[in-house]
Curated annotation (Swiss-Prot):
Protein function: Both copies function as additional regulators for the tsa locus, specifically for tsaT.
InterPro entries for the chain: GAF-like_dom_sf, HTH_MetabolicPath_Reg, Tscrpt_reg_IclR_C, Tscrpt_reg_IclR_N, WH-like_DNA-bd_sf, WH_DNA-bd_sf
Species the sequence originates in: Comamonas testosteroni
Protein name: HTH-type transcriptional regulator TsaQ1/TsaQ2
Lineage start: Bacteria, Pseudomonadati, Pseudomonadota, Betaproteobacteria, Burkholderiales
Residue ranges annotated for the IclR-ED domain, each copy included: 95-266
Length: 278
């Protein structure tokens, strides 16, 4: 199940132009990954919203086609309209289409899992996952739609470091409230990540999430977009010693991102210039 942060207090805050029922409906939709089944009680636990509110909103979302009912379990899944929205966004951006061949090549080269994601509030949601061909290497078993914590992985830290200053300040405040006693340790990781990014252009993590998994990550902001995306290569820590991440893996991932950016610029349609009238 996707990691999710309870934010009922945020949904109840009065803000200019905020439509609360819409915000709550979107909060429910954000709990789902593709193919995942959730019941109303699970959605109550994930969102912190009242049971009656969840029931009313899910019923509406089913009628509109944004959710659908699984006939066997009677639980809910993403509907065709949600999946269609995602396809439309990615077609417009074109990033995944261009990035995937580069990600597959890097995954095969190092025998590691390569992922692409973007920040979703206090986590990073994976958009694309490329695994190595050998089943023996499947230690990092994440799927598209998985949410990863911001402050505990190279993926999350790179996303945070590459975010606009205003967004970064809001996210850091959210993390401070969310993490409580663990905030000081997280803040130190964030500060080290900033220093590392300035020095190397990428961020590494060793044995993150309490597992024997390490990773290296690089962020990018596509032309014409304010949304930072992050590319991440991860695998067993014994295959990713720090010396190798510094000498080979980090620079290779950084070069891959530069190649993707160059290809996106080349694929960008020419700007129409209106001739001046004489």
């Amino acid at each position: 199940m996707a990691t999710h942060v309870k934010t009922p207090d945020q949904l109840q805050e009065s803000g200019t132009g905020l439509v609360h029922s819409l915000a709550k409906g979107l909060e429910i939709l954000s709990c789902f990954s593709e193919g995942e089944l959730l019941g109303n009680q699970q959605l109550v636990e994930l969102t912190g919203l009242p049971k009656a509110t969840v029931s009313r909103l899910t019923s509406t979302l089913v009628k509109l086609g944004y959710l659908q009912v699984d006939p066997r379990s009677r639980k809910l899944a993403m509907g065709a309209r949600v999946l269609g929205l995602g396809v439309s966004v990615q077609r417009k951006l074109g990033l995944q289409r261009i990035a995937r061949p580069h990600m597959e090549a890097l995954s095969q080269r190092f025998g590691l899992t390569v992922t692409m994601g973007t920040r979703d509030r206090l986590s990073v949601v994976l958009l694309e996952v490329c695994r190595p061909p050998s089943l023996a290497q499947l230690v990092v078993n994440f799927d598209a739609g998985t949410h990863m914590p911001l402050s505990q992985t190279a993926l999350g830290l790179a996303s945070l470091v590459n975010s606009p200053v205003k967004d970064r300040e809001q996210v850091i405040e959210g993390l401070r409230k969310q993490l409580g006693d663990q905030w000081v340790e997280a803040r130190n990781r964030i500060e080290r990540a900033h220093q590392e990014h300035e020095r190397y252009g990428y961020i590494v993590s060793q044995r993150s999430l309490g597992r024997d998994v390490s990773g290296v990550a690089v962020g990018m902001v596509p032309m014409g977009s304010n949304t930072p995306y992050v590319f991440h290569m991860a695998g067993p820590s014994n295959q990713m010693p720090l010396s190798l991440m510094r000498s080979d893996m980090g620079p290779a991932l950084k070069q891959m991102v530069q190649d993707i950016q160059a290809e996106m610029r080349a694929a960008r349609p020419p700007k129409l210039v209106v001739p001046k009238e004489f």
